[in-house]
């Protein structure tokens, strides 16, 4: 009795692209494309194959071509995605665990004897990374976010309706105005949920921001949750929109010292991405908090922080 990992490595994907390039002479950056494909699929064979086929059909072997393929793939009604989502109906405990992992950032220790964790691994939703349960890949991760958020949309939640009314306010000359998005979100969140208890905010804040953001970028932009920073205290949302990239850190306020440390970490993270500007969305339960937008510079990086 043994398990066989069928996923492709970065080198394995690169080898496939090397052969393709030899035959088709596209001029692609093979190493870069292999890395991007792996980042989104973690080497899941079907996802690698499907994305490559979609890119091949368009002849756009670039990062933008890949992002377009990812966006289209996530709107497909294929047998793999149908099967995955069907498992959520069949196993309510599995659905609840995945919600806690995705929206609440709940750390889950990998335990092969836990039946729910075992199901999540077997169906391909998650994997074991250094003893922690993490999403198996960005594609499945975003598929789940989209599924859960779409259920909220069908429920006609007020934040979703606010986003639909606002969605045409945020694109200027082809550029996404992320600061303006945060300003409007803070206003709506305070009006709709300002009197809710702390437990509600802590569990629901990030979910409501994604619910507000998704209709704004839908059809044009991509988003994913950065696996390296997913935790109870912090979640980084990465948005790609018409060639521009945005990093939005959502976090729970834990005091000034924690907040300053978080800003330094975000500045370092922006350096990794080659970005000058980053965004923070802080859910603060202090009754004397100052709601709104402020701008600071940390380690040469411009940080725009929204506080609700």
What residues fall within each predicted segment?
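Intrinsically disordered, low-complexity terminal regions enriched in charged/polar residues
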Residues: 296-308
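Active-site metal-binding core of divalent-cation-utilizing nuclease and nuclease-like domains
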Residues: 215-243
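Winged-helix-like regulatory helical subdomains adjacent to P-loop NTPase cores
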Residues: 2, 9-123, 129, 159-163, ...
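Acidic-basic catalytic patches of nuclease active cores, encompassing PD-(D/E)XK
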Residues: 181-224
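Short, amphipathic alpha-helical interaction segments positioned at domain boundaries
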Residues: 140-174
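Minor-groove-contacting beta-hairpin "wing" of winged helix-turn-helix DNA-binding domains
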Residues: 132-137
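Nucleic-acid nuclease catalytic cores
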Residues: 259-263, 270-298
């Amino acid at each position: 009795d043994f398990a066989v990992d069928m996923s492709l490595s970065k080198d394995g994907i690169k080898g496939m692209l090397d052969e393709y390039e030899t035959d088709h002479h596209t001029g692609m950056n093979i190493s870069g494309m292999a890395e991007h494909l792996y980042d989104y699929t973690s080497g899941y064979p079907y996802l690698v194959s499907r994305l490559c086929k979609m890119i091949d059909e368009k002849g756009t072997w670039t990062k933008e071509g890949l992002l377009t393929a990812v966006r289209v793939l996530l709107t497909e009604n294929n047998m793999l995605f149908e099967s995955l989502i069907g498992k959520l109906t069949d196993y309510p405990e599995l659905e609840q665990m995945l919600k806690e992992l995705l929206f609440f950032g709940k750390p889950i220790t990998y335990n092969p004897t836990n039946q729910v964790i075992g199901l999540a691994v077997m169906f391909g939703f998650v994997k074991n990374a250094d003893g922690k349960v993490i999403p198996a890949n960005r594609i499945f991760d975003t598929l789940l976010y989209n599924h859960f958020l779409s259920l909220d949309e069908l429920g006609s939640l007020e934040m979703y309706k606010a986003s639909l009314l606002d969605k045409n306010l945020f694109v200027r000359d082809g550029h996404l105005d992320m600061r303006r998005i945060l300003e409007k979100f803070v206003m709506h969140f305070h009006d709709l949920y300002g009197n809710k208890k702390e437990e509600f905010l802590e569990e629901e804040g990030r979910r409501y921001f994604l619910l507000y953001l998704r209709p704004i970028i839908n059809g044009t932009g991509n988003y994913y949750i950065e696996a390296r920073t997913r935790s109870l205290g912090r979640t980084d949302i990465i948005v790609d929109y018409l060639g521009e990239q945005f990093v939005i850190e959502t976090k729970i306020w834990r005091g000034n010292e924690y907040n300053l440390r978080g800003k330094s970490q975000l500045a370092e993270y922006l350096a990794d991405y080659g970005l000058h500007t980053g965004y923070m969305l802080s859910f603060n339960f202090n009754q004397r908090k100052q709601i709104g937008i402020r701008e600071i510079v940390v380690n040469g990086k411009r940080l725009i922080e929204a506080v609700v």
